Every structure is written in structure tokens, then in C-alpha cells.
Amino acid sequence: MPEGGTFLYDFALPDAGTFWYHPHLNSLEQVGRGLTAPLIVDEAEPPEVDADLTLMLNDWRLDAEARIAGGWDDLHDRAHAGRIGNYMTVNGRPVEVQGAEAGARLRLRIINAATDRIVMLGTFGLRAYLVA
């Protein structure tokens, strides 16, 4: 595809769900620089919810000037297929507390795009159901 050009992919998506896409060529660096995005395939009959939220979690290794740090050839990071960052984001923004009305039904589509971090999540006393 030429620089600045476009290309339209046309393909069937047989399964509904929450997915994400990212490169597999030099993926440590490209994913580490943020080349990722959610891919949501809706059901034919989606559940009734008050809000359907996609939360893409990531951590970034930033240098002292708050730029994405280099060091893409670090053997430790490559051996572990990822690197721990020092700054967490949700949907590319600083982590914020999210509120909801009492009794609201929320669908959270959670994607962990961090290359080497396991993110612990909790519902803090709320009733939650794992769908998939």
C-alpha cells in the first residue's frame, strides 16, 4: 500500500466477540509503540446493557522526557517477549476511576495490550459475571 493510501479489507467474521489486532512482524517494538487497536464484532442480538465499554489496557516504558523509551534489542525483553512499562493507560489515557449509576448493567470489554504485564482487576464488592 502506498504511503498515505488506503486499503479496504472485506472478509467474513463468523464469531462475535472482543478481539484486538496488532502486528506480528517485529511485534515487541511495534506493539510497544502502540500499534494496536480493538476489533469488536457484535452479536446478532446483543445483550441489553446500560453501557458497552471497551477498555484497552497498556503500559508504556517512558524515558525521563516522557517519550517511549528505546532499547528494543534488550535480550531480557526479547527473551520474555515483552517489557514491563512504567506508565499505565486505559484507552491511551491515564487511568481514571470510572463511575456508574447504582444498578446499571455494564458490559466491559477488557483487552490487555501490555506486552509483559499481568493486570489484576477487581469489582470491589460489586456483583460481576464473567461472560467469556
Where are the model-predicted features located?
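Short loop/turn segments at secondary-structure transitions that flank enzyme active sites
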Residues: S27-E29, E45, R61-D63, A114-D116, ...
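Acidic-aromatic/histidine active-site loop/patch
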Residues: A51-R105, R109-T115
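Extracellular/periplasmic metallocenter environments
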Residues: M1-D50
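Structural recognition of the beta-strand scaffold that forms the well-ordered cores
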Residues: Y9, L53-M56, L130
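A generic structural motif
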Residues: T6, A16-T18, R105, T115-D116, ...
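Solvent-exposed beta-strand/loop surfaces of large extracellular or lumenal domains
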Residues: T123-A132
